[in-house]
Curated annotation (Swiss-Prot):
Expression is abundant in central nervous system (brain lobes and the ventral nerve cord) starting at embryonic stage 13 through to third instar larvae. Also expressed in photoreceptors in the eye imaginal disks and the Bolwig organs of the peripheral nervous system. Belongs to the endophilin family. Residues 277-294 have a biased composition (Low complexity). It comes from Drosophila melanogaster. This is Endophilin-A. The gene is EndoA. GO terms for cellular component: cytosol; glutamatergic synapse; membrane; presynapse; type I terminal bouton.
Length: 369
């Protein structure tokens, strides 16, 4: 910074402290300007908070959001593009119903068929929710972000510049500088005042565009709920048909089988041909004790030890959401390999991501993880 510029900054700082501590009077702007400043400050807070709350509305699970942010950050660091979509609750429930409906068997179970129908409906609702997310991000969140990073940023820049030039002007007047210096400072002060006023006015008088964005948001929500209502109406009719089908089916008769029906052949404890219990042979060996033998108990331990894990070589403090903190010598359970440099693991009931260079793998993950 040149000496003249440094001197100007010192003078402005001196004027600021004189006004705050010494009671000096600075140039006062009118009430209309101060009201525009207040509304602009509220708009800055509104845009920041509205973006945050809208994202939480679309993706309410904070753990899933943190995991997505961590994966996105790791992908940027590693230079690898990684597919990363928010797990819609409708989709998770749909997957559960579809999986177990097919396991039960749709051929013989109306309940299994109903589960599959319900799962397919929820899957459609999850797809509709993804469309809602894309619509809101494109037509509501992106304009807000543009407003925050361009319009508001420009207005706040003019306001900051206005404050600096006002201090410079008042400092030159207080110190009774040369007339041409005071006039030059006054001209710059007036120029910044004009730019700040026009910028704030244009921002605050743009209601048409802002309300249009709210209309788009409301229309997207209406379309989402309308499509979901159509899906649920069809599902309700289908499930009522399945209920009627289940009620009209004849009830199957079931006769439990006996040991004789199973053609068991052997010694004591069986049944005679007439169905009466046979006597236990005195030579028959006694039943084994239900107590677990030491050999069986010990056999469980190695399996537990074979769980993929690693030992921390150093302390790790997270820098991003979703990362896992741990201390040196902690034993961390390995859950997944994110890429060549990062793991996903768990320790002390917490899960998250951590760099491979901070740990020594003791039991590696199976191939493919």
């Amino acid at each position: 910074m040149a000496f003249a510029g440094l001197k100007k900054q010192i003078n402005k700082a001196n004027q600021y402290m004189t006004e705050k501590m010494g009671g000096a009077e600075g140039t006062k702007l009118d009430m209309d300007f101060m009201e525009m400043e207040r509304k602009t400050d509220v708009t800055v807070e509104l845009v920041e908070e509205l973006q945050l709350k809208t994202k939480e509305f679309l993706q309410p699970n904070p753990t899933a959001r943190a995991k997505m942010a961590a994966v996105k950050g790791i992908s940027k660091l590693s230079g690898q593009a990684k597919s990363n979509t928010y797990p819609q609750p409708e989709g998770l429930l749909a997957e559960c119903m579809l999986t177990y409906g097919k396991k039960l068997g749709e051929d013989n179970s109306v309940f299994a068929q109903a589960l599959v129908e319900f799962g397919e409906a929820l899957k459609q609702m999850a797809d509709v929710k993804y469309s809602l997310d894309d619509n809101i991000k494109q037509n509501f969140l992106e304009p807000l972000h543009h407003m925050q990073t361009k319009d508001l940023k420009e207005v706040m820049h003019h306001r900051k510049k206005l404050q600096g030039r006002r201090l410079d002007f008042d400092c030159k007047r207080r110190r009774q500088a040369k007339d041409d210096e005071i006039r030059g400072a006054e001209d710059k002060f007036g120029e910044s005042l004009q730019l700040a006023q026009v910028g704030m006015f244009n921002l605050l008088e743009n209601d048409t565009e802002h309300v249009s964005q709210l209309v788009t948001f409301a229309e997207a929500l209406y379309d989402f709920h309308s499509q979901c209502a159509d899906v649920l109406r069809g599902l309700q009719e289908t499930l009522q048909e399945k209920r009627s089908e289940a009620e009209s089916r004849p009830r199957n008769e079931f006769v439990p089988k006996t040991l004789l029906d199973l053609n068991l052949d052997g010694g004591g404890g069986g049944l005679n041909e007439d169905g009466t219990p046979s006597h236990i042979s005195s030579s028959a060996s006694p039943l084994p004790s239900p107590m677990r033998s030491p050999a069986k108990s010990m056999a469980v331990t190695p399996q537990r030890q074979q769980q993929p894990c690693c030992q921390a070589l150093y302390d790790f403090e997270p820098e991003n959401p979703g990362e896992l903190a741990f201390k040196e010598n902690d034993i961390i359970t390995l859950l997944n390999r994110v890429d060549d440099n990062w793991f996903e693991g768990a320790v002390n009931g917490r899960t998250g991501y951590f760099p491979q260079s901070y740990v020594q793998v003791q039991v590696p993950l199976p191939n493919g993880n």
